[in-house]
Amino acid sequence: MIKTALVAALAMVGVANAYISTGQCPTPTLKASFDAVKYMGLWYEQARDGGMPWESNDCQQARYSLNTDGTVAVKNSQYDPVADQVDVATATATFDGAKGAVRFFEYAPAGDYEVLDTDYSTFAIVYSCSSYYLAKAEYIWVLTREQFVDDTLMFSALQTIRNKVPNYDQTSIRRTTHGGSCKYLNEVQPY
């Protein structure tokens, strides 16, 4: 019972810090002919919704690898400069085309994971939305294969978000810092 209450409380904290607006979740056009195998590997987070309490630091990475049962192993990391450590969260995801569901905790509901667009070798734009009665909580991530990207790529990503999710408030998007004092996972995984 206590564990269930804790999971529910954490979920509500996440909802309380998302970009919340009225209405139901949209159904944006997702990446056509999504190829999960090409999507696997290391991604650097370049931007995200600024209200995510569990992603409060910089130096963010996401690693995806296929499991033998067809699910996807997810390993997200961020550097915590106060503790001088890399924090890691693991999850399992399932995909049906470009629409996925990610579960970080056994008893927590799976989170929405929609690939709006990707070229697999340079960038990916991910959208998530959960409906709650008359409101919705939305999140956005811009991922890249390279640690550093130019403003042209970011401008293009923001334009794609504007076109595919026109009512999403882009003022909530926060750029992620890389380089400098960043520390990353020191592991190499086959993908």
Language model features: what each stretch is:
Residues I2-Y191:
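A beta-rich soluble binding module of mature secreted/lumenal proteins
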